[in-house]
């Protein structure tokens, strides 16, 4: 995948259970991260793999959700749970370093 490191946010700005929308790997690519635990974050392309609608996190259902055609994805892996999407969400490698959340690469 593409490997350009980019600081996305101070980790203190994103509470556990919250999401943050950013742009990666380019300024035209919407991405979203979820802070699962104090030192655990995951991030994905915000574009559904079905027809490209915007996905968001549904905390009460513990899933990524696409409202266009009811596609649902597993929160940690981005794998398809249900609906028409043909494959998992594009995954962004993220990690917390020195209280900054870094995006380190993208796997479509």
Label every model-predicted segment.
Residues 1-59, 87-108:
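N-terminal pre-ligand scaffold of iron-sulfur
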Residues 33, 72-73:
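Hydrophobic beta-strand positions
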Residues 42, 71-72:
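A residue-level detector for well-ordered beta-strand positions
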Residues 50, 69, 76:
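Short glycine/serine/threonine-biased micro-segments
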Residues 56-59, 74-78:
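Short Cys/His-rich "knuckle" micro-motifs
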Residues 62-70, 80-90:
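Short cysteine/histidine-rich metal-coordination sites, predominantly Zn2+-binding motifs
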Residues 73-74, 94:
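Active-site and channel-lining beta-strand-loop segments
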């Amino acid at each position: 995948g593409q490997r350009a490191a980019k600081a996305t946010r101070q980790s203190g700005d994103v509470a556990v259970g919250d999401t943050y929308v950013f742009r990666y790997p380019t300024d035209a690519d919407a991405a979203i991260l979820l802070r699962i635990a104090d030192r655990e974050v995951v991030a994905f392309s915000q574009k559904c793999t079905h027809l490209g609608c915007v996905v968001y996190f549904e905390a009460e259902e513990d899933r990524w959700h696409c409202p266009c055609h009811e596609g649902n994805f597993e929160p940690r892996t981005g794998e398809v749970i249900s609906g028409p999407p043909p494959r998992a969400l594009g995954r962004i490698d993220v990690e917390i370093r020195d209280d900054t959340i870094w995006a380190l690469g993208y796997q479509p």
